[in-house]
UniProtKB/Swiss-Prot annotation:
Function according to Swiss-Prot or TrEMBL: Allows the formation of correctly charged Gln-tRNA(Gln) through the transamidation of misacylated Glu-tRNA(Gln) in organisms which lack glutaminyl-tRNA synthetase. The reaction takes place in the presence of glutamine and ATP through an activated gamma-phospho-Glu-tRNA(Gln).
Annotated protein name in UniProt: Glutamyl-tRNA(Gln) amidotransferase subunit A
UniProt entry keywords in alphabetical sequence: ATP-binding, Ligase, Nucleotide-binding, Protein biosynthesis
MF terms in GO: ATP binding; glutaminyl-tRNA synthase (glutamine-hydrolyzing) activity
Length: 486
């Protein structure tokens, strides 16, 4: 077994026992990137010098008997949406090409303090707007299970890097499913924490009331360990929740016997791939065999979730992206004749088609005469969606559903059909509108060898419950041991 075949916690155990060094693991990760990334294209940039320096420092701490954390020395990748001091950060956009942040995002600082070498920045849909990684301004990433297909998005580079075993884990962000959907498409675990559980300070904003960073790993236990490092209140983020952080690993092995798990009937609809439905329904039966009770529940306003999301998220994006004008950082149009030209030409040249589409949608929703009819109404429906979940959680401990309606699709298949692309998040975005935690865990493969994910949704701040439920299923299977055919 190669070092890169180990999970985060397996590697951490070897580091603690002196059976491997962080420098060896980091060099193995860098070698794996060199070997397979020409096919996967998960990385936008690799910080070899920084990662190796951090690895050597980790080895020195372990040698002196003072590791910074249980994960000290475990190499990690970062979605290119997190500000990294001294390392270019683009959010997958031309408009930020060449931007080198002067400080770290809070989660990056926490990872560094915990001793994890950061190997590099991972590809993503531009400003996290997309479900296939094809809106990246630089190149699309490829799914390690079939390189002609998408790894999902917007955190597709993070998912692909973990699935290809280029890194032991990664961080992504989830605004409407951008951690969970690519996790489902790549046989990885993706956890979107409760809104406010993880700091957004230093995370380039898409939709501020929806964005949430989270872990992407090969196993549930790894996700719990990584969440433990990054989950905490942050005075620099006004939306950060001042809620106690539990030990996410404490009850991982507690099982599901006696739990009530809801199955929302609105999440099993026409348009779902038959093989996806079959895999998910088999997972539901597995939970019954493990001692859980399945309960049919209804989330009646789910049918309005997609329209609600695509009013609220673009409205927030149109405001957040107004700051990119060529004056302070990133791209500046060279052929401008006036300040007005600088603004207009920089945005014309710097933003891609999908970002422009969403800015226009959001500007329209907020415009005079349409604000009440569209944006305000969407916010009211958002409240109804949140109330649906509140009622459901009075009956059950968690909800189970597919993560994605289909397995990974061919690159180029949906790029000219925005609505079809938006439908990829139909099962994931209601959770963001309600601010709830959600997790995707591998639950099988199609006949063509494409991964399928099971989504688990929970009460606010019950990430520990989701991890426990996911682990009960994962314990019965070896999906995470399977290697992508690279």
């Amino acid at each position: 077994m190669q070092l890169t075949d180990l999970t985060m916690l397996e590697l951490a155990a070897k580091l603690a026992a002196g059976e491997a060094s962080s420098e060896e693991a980091t060099r193995a990760s860098l070698a794996r990137i060199q070997q397979v990334d020409p096919k996967v294209r998960a990385f936008l940039r690799v910080d070899e010098a920084g990662a190796l320096a951090a690895a050597r420092a980790s080895d020195a701490r372990r040698k002196s008997g003072s590791p910074a954390s249980a994960l000290d020395g475990v190499p990690l990748g970062l979605k290119d949406i997190f500000l990294t001091e001294g390392v270019e950060t683009t959010a997958g956009s031309r408009i930020l090409e060449g931007f080198v942040p002067p400080y770290d995002a809070t989660v990056v600082r926490l990872l560094k303090e915990a001793g994890l070498p950061l190997v590099g920045k991972l590809n993503m849909d531009e400003f996290a707007m997309g479900s296939s990684n094809e809106s990246s301004a630089f190149f699309p990433s490829h799914n390690p299970w079939d390189v002609s297909r998408t790894p999902g998005g917007s955190s597709g580079g993070s998912a692909a890097a973990v699935a290809a075993r280029e890194v032991f884990g990664a961080l992504g962000t989830d605004t409407g499913g951008s951690i969970r959907q690519p996790a489902a498409l790549t046989n990885t675990v993706g956890l979107k924490p409760t809104y406010g559980r993880v700091s957004r300070f230093g995370v380039i904003a898409f939709a501020s009331s929806l964005d949430q960073p989270g872990p992407m790993t090969r196993t549930v236990a790894d996700a719990a360990a990584l969440l433990q490092v990054i989950a905490r209140p942050d005075a620099q983020d006004a939306t950060s929740a001042d809620a106690p952080v539990p030990d996410y690993s404490a009850d991982l092995e507690a099982g599901v016997r006696g739990l009530k798990l809801g199955v929302p009937r609105e999440y099993f609809t026409e348009g779902m791939d038959p093989e996806v439905e079959a895999a998910v329904r088999e997972a539901l039966r597995e939970y019954e065999r493990l001692g859980a009770t399945l309960v049919d529940v209804s989330l009646p306003h789910t049918k309005y979730a997609l329209a609600t999301y695509y009013l609220i998220a673009p409205a927030e994006a149109s405001s957040n992206l107004a700051r990119y004008d060529g004056v302070r950082f990133g791209l500046r149009a060279k052929d401008a004749r006036s300040l007005r030209d600088v603004y207009a030409l920089t945005r014309e040249q710097g933003f891609g088609a999908e970002v422009k589409r969403r800015i226009m949608l959001g500007t329209f929703a907020l415009s005079s005469g349409y604000y009440d009819a569209h944006y305000l109404r969407a916010q009211k429906v958002r409240t109804l969606i949140r109330e649906d979940f509140t009622r459901a959680f009075q009956q059950v401990d968690a909800l189970l559903s597919p993560t994605s309606p289909v397995p990974a699709f061919k690159l180029g298949e949906k790029v000219e059909d925005p609505l079809s692309m938006y439908l990829m998040d139909i099962y994931t975005l209601p959770c963001n509108l309600a601010g709830l935690p959600g997790l995707s865990v591998p639950c099988g493969f199609t006949k063509a060898g494409l991964p399928v994910g099971l989504q688990i949704l929970g009460r606010p701040f019950d990430e520990a419950g989701l991890l426990r439920i996911a682990r009960a299923y994962e314990r019965e299977h070896d999906f995470f041991r399977r290697s992508a055919p690279l």
